[in-house]
Design a protein with these regions (language model features):
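Conserved catalytic alpha/beta core of Sir2/sirtuin-type deacylases, generalized to analogous enzyme cores
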Residues: 1-205
Length: 205
C-alpha cells in the first residue's frame, strides 16, 4: 500500500508509483490475456498452454548499483527467480565478484581522491575500495581465464585432428560470466545465483 500510494504523492514519487504498477502488470501478464493471432503456433491456440506463457523479464543495471547496497536487492531478485535475465556492464560483473573477495567501506563524498590514492584507496562516490581488492580479484580471475583458454585450445586441437564429433568451442561473454558464478561459490553474489538458477547475464559493455 505504501508503494502504491506514491502514485498520488506528487513530484517524482508519482513516476515511482507508475513503475510499481508497471512491474505488477508485467508479472501478472499471460499470453492468454491476448487475442489469438491468425499466424499463432498451433500449440499456443490451446487456452491452457497460453495461460502458462509469461512475460520474459529483463533487468538492466549499471555498475554503480552493484557497488552500492542495491546489489543485495538485485541478488535477491535472482535468488528468488523474479527475473529471467540480467543485463549489466563489465563493472557490474567486476564489482559483484570483488565484494565476494574483500569488503568495500563507507567513506564520504568530500574525501579527496588524490589523498586517498596516495594511500592505496579508491573512491566510488562515498564508497572506499582498497587497491588490494583489485589485486585479489586479478589473482582469482587470471587462473580461471587460463583454464578457459586451455578448454578452447583443447577443443580446437580435437577439431584439427579430425576426431569424430569434435567441434570448435568458444566462451561467449555470458558463458564466461556463468563460469565465474559457478566458481565464486558465495551466496552473497549476484553471479552465484544467476549461475545456480540458470539465469543468463548479458554484458554488452
Amino acid at each position: 500500500k505504501l508503494l502504491l500510494s506514491y502514485a498520488t504523492t506528487g513530484f517524482t514519487a508519482t513516476t515511482f508509483g507508475q513503475a510499481v504498477e508497471e512491474v505488477k502488470r508485467m508479472r501478472a501478464w499471460r499470453l492468454s490475456d491476448e487475442p489469438i493471432a491468425d499466424d499463432e503456433d498451433e500449440h499456443l491456440k490451446d487456452p491452457a498452454a497460453r495461460a502458462k506463457v509469461k512475460a520474459t523479464i529483463f533487468l538492466g543495471c549499471t555498475s554503480n548499483l552493484v557497488s552500492a547496497g542495491t546489489r543485495e536487492t538485485i541478488r535477491w531478485l535472482l535468488e528468488h527467480r523474479k527475473v529471467d535475465c540480467l543485463v549489466t556492464t563489465g563493472g557490474g560483473i567486476e564489482e559483484d565478484l570483488m565484494k565476494c573477495l574483500a569488503p568495500h567501506y563507507m567513506g564520504d563524498f568530500a574525501l579527496k581522491g588524490a589523498e586517498l590514492r596516495a594511500k592505496g584507496i579508491n573512491r566510488i562516490g562515498n564508497l572506499l575500495v582498497p587497491n588490494r581488492s583489485y589485486c585479489l580479484f586479478e589473482d582469482w580471475l587470471t587462473p580461471m581465464l587460463d583454464e578457459m583458454l586451455d578448454e578452447q585450445n583443447a577443443a580446437a586441437s580435437r577439431v584439427a585432428k579430425g576426431e569424430p564429433g569434435a567441434e570448435p568451442f568458444f566462451f561467449s561473454p555470458s558463458s564466461m560470466i556463468k563460469r565465474m558464478g559457478e566458481k565464486i561459490d558465495n551466496k552473497d553474489s549476484i553471479l552465484y545465483w544467476a549461475a545456480k538458477n540458470d539465469i543468463p547475464i548479458f554484458c554488452p559493455a
